[in-house]
Amino acid sequence: MSGNRAVIALLDRAQTDSDAGQSEAAGASLERALRIEPRNPWLWFELAQLRLAQGQYAQAITLARKSNSFSGRQYRVQAENWRVIARARVSQGDAAGADQAFKRASDLEQQAGAEKDRDAGFHAQ
C-alpha cells in the first residue's frame, strides 16, 4: 500500500480511531495521509470505505472513482472500489446500478486473478 512511514502511521491511527468509533478522527488521518501521497489509490479507497460506513454514499462513490483514476493496472483495488460503489448504490436504492457495479467488481477480481496466475507462471520459468 505504501512504504512511507508517516503514511503507515496515519493509516494505523485511522484504523484505531475507526475501531473506537471515532470516524471523524479516522477521516482526518486519512486526509493527512492523502496530502503526503495524493495519488495512492489505496488511501482513496480507505477514505471511500469510511465515507460509506458514515452513510455518505455520494461521497463514497466519488472517492472510489477517484481511487480508480489512480489505480493503473491494480485490479484488486479497482474491484474493491467497485464493491464500495455497489454497496453505496444499494443504500441509495439503485438496485440496477448496484448490480452493474458488483458485476464490474467480479470481472476485475477475475482479471486480477488471471494476471496473478500469469505472473506466477512467468516467474516459475
Protein language model regions, located:
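Alpha-helical segment of the N-proximal tetratricopeptide repeat
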Residues: 3-28
